[in-house]
Amino acid sequence: MKLSKMQLLVGICTLMLSGTSLAQETKEAIKSEISSEEKIPFNPEVKMGKLANGLTYYIKNNGKPEDKVELRLVVNAGSILEEDDQRGLAHFMEHMNFNGTKNFEKNELVDYLQSIGVKFGAHLNAYTSFDETVYILPIPSDDPEKLEKGFQIIEDWAHNALLTGEQIDDERGVVLEEYRLGQGADERMMQNYLPKLLYGSKYADRLPIGTKDVLENFEYDSLKRFYKDWYRPDLMAVVAVGDVDVATLEQKIKDHFGGIEMPKDPKPRKTFDLPNHKETFIAIESDKEASFSQVQVLFKDKEDAQPDHTLKDYRESMVEGLFSQMINNRLDELRNSPNPPFVYGFSYHGGTYAKTKEAYRSFAMTSETGQLKALETLLEENQRVKQHGFFEGEFERAKKDIMARMEKSYKDKDKMESNRIVGEYVRHYLENEPMPGISWEYDFYKQQLPTISLKEVNALISDYIKEENRVIILTGPEKEGMTQVTEAEVKSLLDDVNKRTLEPYEDKAVAESMITDMPTAGTVTDYKVNDKLGTTTLTLSNGAKVTYKVTDFKNDEILFDAFSYGGSSLYTDEEHIATVNANGGLSEAGVNGFDINEMNKMLSGKIVNVRPRVGTYSEDISGNASPKDLETLFQLVHLYFTSLNKNEEAFGSYIEKQKSFLGNMMSNPQTYFSIKMGEFMYGDSPRYTGFPTPEKMDEADYDLAYKKYQERFADAGDFHFYFVGNINEKELVELASQYLASLPGKGSNEMYEVSDFRPLTGQHEKIIEKGEDPKSSVRITYHGPTEYKAKEDFALETLGEILTIKLVEQLREEEGGVYGVGARGNISNMPYDWYSFNISFPCGPENVEKLKKAALAEVQKLVTDGPTQKDLDKVKETYMLDHKEEMKENRFWLRALKNADYLQKDPNAIMEYESKVKGLTTEYLQDIAKKYLSGDYIVGIHNPES
């Protein structure tokens, strides 16, 4: 499972730097002890083969989750292969494979899969990109018939699509709705800058969604021709990973795919280049509906990308990973500085839209007036590396972080879910990504990471950054009175930064531990074991409770959460309004005198995270850790209770980033609609603060928020802590005694307070106009006061699932009027008893009234006729399959245990879920529909501006 460059980037922890001199050696001059010819081995645990007709397959037996197989049909063909009359048809073909095949006519395929618990969208799915189309099918494997049908389905996708004229025309509306959803500011700006980003390439004219004209008017033969030309064995792979023996899966593949014939004169599968250019292309795009300002700098490689084949290639990818780790640590430190130059920024070397070209890319999101400053910062930081290189301290920390992530993957190598494994096999087929297996990779990292020199990493910058093949893209809002950045300003900045002599980065030493004074340990005063749930609850000497569950679901994971009732519900209305937008910035100050950048340095090589929060009805603290870093987690928890820093500069940095992020959110039509509907539903509440804005962020009261935080976290004895994962019980009890029982306990036993305000009820319709694109959306809400009953809550949730099935059938498949539609229902008992049932869908303005009536008609059918047994059985089967998997997930247990106490429910009900599902009947669901879906409802409609 080779860590990709983006995976290395995403896993980066923020660090600071230390200084040494820059070595000027180039990468070519560096000698490696490993062979430049020795090939990267192939994972021996994976069965890879090729049928006589050219189809490739990958198989692995994997028992997590049990009784399930993940199937993928991978087609090495996407929109780049479309001819002019086929633009958008690679993606259209993906749709058609769900709408009629030889063995599953019309909607029978989705109907069958739903009947065995496979949910359309959430489980069953597919995607199309420039160079590939991938079909995703998880299938239950406890029944041989279900497994057989799963293979029949992917075989049908490969060569048995019916593609009748009627089916094609029926699907046009759905695909056009998906096309409509993609319209907006980002799409308009992208269409303008793509010719520069993808200069001279066919990629610029082959976005997978296609063109409206082709989608509306293409001849049936155009689609059939694409299917015939590109859906063929030599361009396909089947991936099968799951809880079935390899021999059985291999035989299934041979039986279903061995008979597919290759065409006699197959069209060559070309690859398409991204030509080099000497010029620097600059694209500056703005739009009045743009929500964010962004800056991108790309340095496209001169040479075409080559897959990693040898040990030397693999080692070089490790060098690139270290470079990405360190440059992003620097950018993250700047993000945390006073007057930050961007909301966030990152850099990495990786792929572009084109299969054959990679690039070094630096990116930042910034304020609407900060584009030049953000661009300057990105250019300077790259130039700083070029002039001075990285330094020894940050290099060592980067190696620790990368090795910690690799070690985590290695420890959990036998606990990885099948749906996380298949992606690597897909990339191996499409991109020739090596897949030697995590055991080999872990050993290789242990062997080679210490041998990588700082000189090797520093040499990369000269390869990455050149004036040719450079593209700079600025996108952002357009509004009256705002001066746009010009191309001349960008060129001037490029020349200026290139001439600057910059100071090297400075590193400041930090302490070994964040705990400076070890707290005096408390004691455990009571143990309670729940054999039914497999949990133990400790009562500590300060009154705090600790519930933990030892699991073997993951070897290197412990999850944690804690709460105490109260939150800002105990504030006055004025205090709530003054602090609500400040609370998120409190932890930015760090703890115990260490700022956030120093903390990140001290946490190098550790897998640990802790997040405190003051919510509306509770104060919470949550996180996760590797078992080896559990003490660090406990130390952080202790410090967030006792020693949160107060730092005006850090808080000011947080406010500036939030203002930059929020500054133009109201320009987005969908966001505007959500905000205005919120005001319509809740605007009369004295505690309703609405959507945060730059003006509201300026009014956030840091002093008051800090004071209130201290009050809310002053009594640890009122908290209940939860831990789930690979726990050493003796260690956890000792750590809880040392770091939790030692916290102040006052015996307060607080409860949240509930205001008298309730959302708007009754029969209402609100129409909100915003935006220029012909896009509308509809929300229908049934809600009001009730008496909470767990059985009714579950029934209303189930009605939402059933109604979603019916709405997809009616609004999408029959009417062709929507791409996505859904319904959700629940009854809550916190902060007060209240039911809510929501329906939402986007559509064309011309279809709003028709589809609204159609949706309400489906609701009425549930009231007058009740759901069918067939639809109820579909939902029940999905519930059962999902629950079976959840019962072996740490995250499920953490959430379930906490919520049982938080919502004051019986935790033992966790074990009664299956009987609860089996007890659902159509008669009872109809009664619930009559009770909750027969009355008033509120309709919100978003339309474009007239």
Predicted features by range, described:
Residues 1-9:
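Bacterial N-terminal signal peptides that target proteins for export
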Residues 89-97, 323, 582:
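Active-site His/Glu-centered metal-binding helix of metallohydrolases
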Residues 167, 172-180, 184-235, 239-241, ...:
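Hydrophobic, small-residue-rich alpha-helical packing segments that form membrane-like cores
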